Amino acid sequence: SGHYEMGVLQSKMHMAWMRAVAGRMKSDYQYSAQIVYNNFPWPDLPEKLEPNQPQTPTHKAQAAIEKAAQAVLDARAQFPGSSLADLYDPLTMPPALLKAHQKLDAAVDAAYALVGGKKTWKNDAERVAFLFERYQHLTSLLPAAKGKGKEKAKGKAGRKQA
């Protein structure tokens, strides 16, 4: 249906990633498929649910994202005369659209919770830190060492030169 992908791409999780890795031209973000999209660490969810297959938590997470993404589209459709710029103006965003996005963010966060993320995030910095850890896990041949880099850096800085 495409609603799953659209939902993840419209989420706070993806927006935080985009703001962290996208280039900029003046104050505008430059969304690059090669840098932003292709390197985005998607949640591990199945492609589709096969007939007569029991629903797993990942299938339920995918269905929740699809449903929430459709709710965002439905909320936008309530304002056919409004442009996206008008709908997403922080001062005048319709409450129904804001609520739909909040539900979408919760559904996406729940999907990431299945792969080690939190169910709620304090801020975008936490989201981005998790996404970079996930990216490292997905692209590394060896498991990521937690905290090792900080300890090594402290140890080298604290050593006296002989």
Where do the model's predicted regions map?
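S-adenosyl-L-methionine
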Residues: 1-162
